[in-house]
C-alpha cells in the first residue's frame, strides 16, 4: 500500500477490520462451508485478526476468487488468484503492543479486536518467526532492566511498542523500540544483551512517541546500534527500509505482484511513466530499467527522501521524484501540454478520489496500471475510468495476506478515446 507511509494505527497484522461497504458493494462473505485446516491458531478467538483462521488454504483462495469474479464482473475477466506455496510466517514486518496487567504481568502482542486491550501472543502463524522470538525476549528482559510498559490511560511508563523488520533477501534485521521518552536507562547494556540473544540484529532504533495518540510511531528516531535502517532486495533492486518506510510485508508475493504490474505496462524503453503514490519508489525504480523516463510523485516527505536514496543506491538515473499531490501534479502537467504514456497507480486501501481520477483522464495516458489493495475501491475506481474513455480486459488477484480477507489486484486500463 504505497499510500500508508510512515506512521500507522494500532496493529495492522491482527487488528484490521473487514472491508466496509463502498458504493453498495457487498462485504467479503463469511465462509459458510469451512474446510478445516490443521493450522489452527490458539489466539484466534481473542485476537480476531485472521478472518480465515482454521480454514483450509485452498478454500480461502476459492472464496477470494469467487468474490473478485462477482465484484469485477461488470468490468473485466478475473484471472485465477495467485496464491502462496507456503502461506505461513509471511509477514516480515512485525509489530507488538506492550502493556502490564493488573496483576503485574507484562504482555506483548496484538490489540484485541476493536479495543486497546493487549492479547499476550508468544508466536503468530503469519509472522516471521525470528521476529517473534526477538519480541518475546525483549518482553522477558524488561524486568531485569526495570523498564516499565506505557499505560495509555495514565500516561505513565516507557515502552509502548516494538517493531521488528527483516529483509527477506538480505536477512538484515531492524528492531525499533517505541518509547514515551528519548531516554532508555542502561541503553548500551540493553542493546548488548539483546544482541547477545540475537546476533543477527543489524540495527536498533529508539523511536520517540511522547504524545497521547493511537499512532504507533513518533516523528523522532535515535539510532542506538547500526545504521538506523536495513536493506532488502526486490525484483533485482536494493531498497532502504527505515523505521517508518512503507515496504510491502509479504516479499514473496510482492515480487510477483510488481513483476505483473511492470509486464502490464508493456514498456519498450521509450515510455514516459508516472509512478503515482510512489512511496519509497519501489515500483518506479523497478520500472525505470525498462522505461525512457519515470516520474515518481508522493505526498509523504520522508518517503520521497528514501525514494531518492533508493534510486541512487541502484544507479537509476532516468527517474525523478516530486514531493507533491499526484493528482494536482498531473493536472498541471496536462495544463502545460505535457504527456505521459503510462501511469502506475498504487493507492492506499481507501482507493483514489475523484480529483485524482479526473487528473488521469485529463492527462490521458495510453495505459493505466492499477495496483490495488482494496477490491471494493478498485471496482469503484474502474467504474469511473471506464466511463471516461478507458477499457480493462482482465484483472489478476494476488493473495498477499493469507488467512485474512485482504486481496491485492493488478489490472491494466487502455485509453480508447473520449
PLM segments and residue spans:
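Accessory substrate-recognition/RNA-binding modules or partner subunits associated with SAM-dependent
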Residues: 120-122, 126, 131, 135, ...
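Short, solvent-exposed loop/turn elements at beta->coil junctions and helix N-caps
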Residues: 80-87, 152-153, 161, 165, ...
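Short, aliphatic-rich beta-strand segments
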Residues: 99, 164, 171-180, 238-242, ...
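Short, acidic/hydrophobic/Gly-rich beta-strand patch recurrent on exposed beta strands
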Residues: 109-112, 176-178, 307
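Extended interfacial segments that mediate partner engagement and assembly in macromolecular machines
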Residues: 35-39, 45-149, 169, 184
Amino acid at each position: 500500500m504505497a499510500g500508508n507511509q510512515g506512521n500507522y494505527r494500532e496493529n495492522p497484522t491482527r487488528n484490521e477490520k473487514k472491508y466496509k461497504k463502498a458504493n453498495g458493494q457487498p462485504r467479503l462473505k463469511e465462509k459458510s462451508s469451512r474446510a478445516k485446516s490443521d493450522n489452527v491458531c490458539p489466539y484466534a478467538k481473542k485476537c480476531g485478526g485472521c478472518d480465515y483462521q482454521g480454514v483450509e488454504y485452498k478454500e480461502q483462495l476459492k472464496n477470494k476468487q469467487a468474490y473478485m469474479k462477482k465484484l469485477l464482473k461488470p468490468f473485466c475477466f478475473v484471472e485465477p488468484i495467485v496464491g502462496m506455496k507456503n502461506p505461513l510466517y509471511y509477514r516480515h514486518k512485525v509489530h507488538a503492543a506492550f502493556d502490564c496487567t493488573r496483576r503485574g504481568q507484562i504482555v506483548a502482542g496484538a490489540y484485541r479486536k476493536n479495543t486497546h486491550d493487549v492479547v499476550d501472543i508468544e508466536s503468530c502463524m503469519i509472522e516471521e518467526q525470528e521476529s517473534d522470538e526477538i519480541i518475546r525476549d525483549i518482553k522477558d528482559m524488561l524486568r531485569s532492566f526495570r523498564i516499565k510498559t506505557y499505560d495509555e490511560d495514565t500516561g505513565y511508563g516507557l515502552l509502548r511498542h516494538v517493531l521488528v523488520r527483516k529483509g527477506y533477501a538480505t536477512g538484515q534485521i531492524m528492531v525499533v523500540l517505541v518509547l514515551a521518552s528519548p531516554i532508555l536507562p542502561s541503553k548500551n547494556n540493553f542493546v548488548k544483551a539483546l544482541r547477545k540473544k540475537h546476533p543477527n540484529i543489524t540495527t536498533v532504533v529508539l523511536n520517540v512517541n511522547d504524545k497521547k495518540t493511537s499512532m504507533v510511531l513518533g516523528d523522532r528516531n535515535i539510532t542506538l546500534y547500526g545504521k538506523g535502517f536495513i536493506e532488502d532486495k526486490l525484483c533485482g533492486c536494493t531498497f532502504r527500509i527505515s523505521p517508518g518506510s512503507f515496504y510491502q510485508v509479504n516479499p514473496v508475493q510482492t515480487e510477483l505482484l510488481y513483476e505483473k504490474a511492470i509486464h502490464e505496462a508493456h514498456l519498450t524503453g521509450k515510455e514516459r511513466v508516472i509512478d503515482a503514490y510512489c512511496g519509497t519508489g519501489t515500483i518506479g525504480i523497478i520500472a525505470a530499467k525498462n522505461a525512457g523516463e519515470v516520474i515518481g510523485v508522493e505526498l509523504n516527505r520522508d518517503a520521497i527522501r528514501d525514494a531518492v536514496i533508493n534510486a541512487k543506491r541502484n544507479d537509476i538515473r532516468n527517474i525523478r521524484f516530486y514531493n507533491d499531490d499526484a493528482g494536482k501534479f498531473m493536472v498541471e502537467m496536462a495544463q502545460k501540454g505535457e504527456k505521459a504514456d503510462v501511469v502506475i497507480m498504487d493507492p492506499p486501501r481507501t482507493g483514489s478520489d475523484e480529483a485524482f481520477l479526473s487528473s488521469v483522464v485529463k492527462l490521458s495516458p495510453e495505459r493505466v496500471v492499477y495496483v490495488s489493495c482494496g477490491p471494493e475501491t478498485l471496482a469503484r475506481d474502474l467504474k469511473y475510468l471506464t466511463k471516461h474513455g478507458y477499457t480493462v480486459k482482465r484483472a489478476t488477484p494476488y493473495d498477499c495476506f493469507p488467512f485474512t480477507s485482504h486481496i491485492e489486484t493488478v489490472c491494466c486500463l487502455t485509453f480508447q478515446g473520449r
